[in-house]
Amino acid sequence: MVTGVFAALGFVVKELVFLVSYVKNNAFPQPLSSSEEKKYLELMAKGDEHARNMLIEHNLRLVAHIVKKFENTGEDAEDLISIGTIGLIKGIESYSAGKGTKLATYAARCIENEIVITKGGCIHPSLIRFNIYGVRIHNGNFFHDKVNNCFFIFKSMPPLFVMNNEILMHLRALKKTKKDVSLHDPIGQDKEGNEISLIDVLKSENEDVIDTIQLNMELEKVKQYIDILDDREKEVIVGRFGLDLKKEKTQREIAKELGISRSYVSRIEKRALMKMFHEFYRAEKEKRKKAKGK
């Protein structure tokens, strides 16, 4: 769960909130013409911030369109819009006209990929995500994401798209099935004919050691960015994600401890995560600049 904190954010928190409000209220600027889009892409390539913002704002309707695909999954619409907006920003910033793909097509894929990768198996019936090492699946296909150290296990292998040297997964929505996948879903039978579920396959003698190693690695990442938060934000994030190596708490539990409302805890959590997202993105951008300079 800690890994999800590090979805790269390509925009400052204030701007992201502003963009999300656009989508929530369906207040979309008109799409750019081909000539306008080309002009702004050329200006953005030269470092023009206004051009970048224009490209993002005038493609916000793509976020609303993609989010509708996930409206029956039980996920919070505001969360999906926020994640989709991050995907749009990544798409705009990484787009290359020389690859022959239209900006809208590329951005739409990035939006859907961001939602699927961030939400994982709980959101899409064709994907199950496990943040665990050493898993062997005998029934089904799997893909190992080396960046986030997690496995993606598919009931049927979806198409893969390669963009900017990163493997991005574009999963076609299943029209007939829109229910969550449970770890207790049957995936086959053992030699005696007994039904085997996913949770049975994942059990191993070393799972406690494996989980501890992974958690410690992720905690080291979090420690790099948690100091930018104020005391209240730290308290909420530590409790919610179990960063003190204790049980993760619900927003309701934290609200009771702090004597505030659950909705206020939710706002604090989102604000804190956005701060961490932005700091992570800034740090990664600096790393890329240094790498290019070598």
UniProtKB/Swiss-Prot annotation:
<dbReference type="InterPro" id="IPR000943">
    <property type="entry name" value="RNA_pol_sigma70"/>
</dbReference>
<dbReference type="InterPro" id="IPR007627">
    <property type="entry name" value="RNA_pol_sigma70_r2"/>
</dbReference>
<keyword id="KW-0749">Sporulation</keyword>
<keyword id="KW-0238">DNA-binding</keyword>
<dbReference type="InterPro" id="IPR013324">
    <property type="entry name" value="RNA_pol_sigma_r3/r4-like"/>
</dbReference>
<feature type="short sequence motif" description="Polymerase core binding">
    <location>
        <begin position="79"/>
        <end position="92"/>
    </location>
</feature>
<dbReference type="GO" id="GO:0003677">
    <property type="term" value="F:DNA binding"/>
</dbReference>
<feature type="propeptide">
    <location>
        <begin position="1"/>
        <end position="20"/>
    </location>
</feature>
<keyword id="KW-0804">Transcription</keyword>
<dbReference type="InterPro" id="IPR014284">
    <property type="entry name" value="RNA_pol_sigma-70_dom"/>
</dbReference>
<protein>
    <recommendedName>
        <fullName>RNA polymerase sigma-K factor</fullName>
    </recommendedName>
</protein>
<dbReference type="InterPro" id="IPR013325">
    <property type="entry name" value="RNA_pol_sigma_r2"/>
</dbReference>
<dbReference type="InterPro" id="IPR050813">
    <property type="entry name" value="Sigma-70_Factor"/>
</dbReference>
<keyword id="KW-0805">Transcription regulation</keyword>
<dbReference type="GO" id="GO:0030435">
    <property type="term" value="P:sporulation resulting in formation of a cellular spore"/>
</dbReference>
<dbReference type="Pfam" id="PF04545">
    <property type="entry name" value="Sigma70_r4"/>
</dbReference>
<dbReference type="GO" id="GO:0006352">
    <property type="term" value="P:DNA-templated transcription initiation"/>
</dbReference>
<feature type="region of interest" description="Not present in recombined mature factor">
    <location>
        <begin position="114"/>
        <end position="165"/>
    </location>
</feature>
<feature type="region of interest" description="Encoded by spoIVCB">
    <location>
        <begin position="1"/>
        <end position="156"/>
    </location>
</feature>
<comment type="function">
    <text>Sigma factors are initiation factors that promote the attachment of RNA polymerase to specific initiation sites and are then released. This sigma factor is responsible for the expression of sporulation specific genes in the mother cell.</text>
</comment>
<dbReference type="Pfam" id="PF04542">
    <property type="entry name" value="Sigma70_r2"/>
</dbReference>
<feature type="region of interest" description="Encoded by spoIIIC">
    <location>
        <begin position="157"/>
        <end position="294"/>
    </location>
</feature>
<keyword id="KW-0731">Sigma factor</keyword>
<feature type="DNA-binding region" description="H-T-H motif">
    <location>
        <begin position="251"/>
        <end position="270"/>
    </location>
</feature>
<dbReference type="GO" id="GO:0016987">
    <property type="term" value="F:sigma factor activity"/>
</dbReference>
<dbReference type="InterPro" id="IPR007630">
    <property type="entry name" value="RNA_pol_sigma70_r4"/>
</dbReference>
<comment type="similarity">
    <text>Belongs to the sigma-70 factor family.</text>
</comment>
<dbReference type="InterPro" id="IPR001387">
    <property type="entry name" value="Cro/C1-type_HTH"/>
</dbReference>
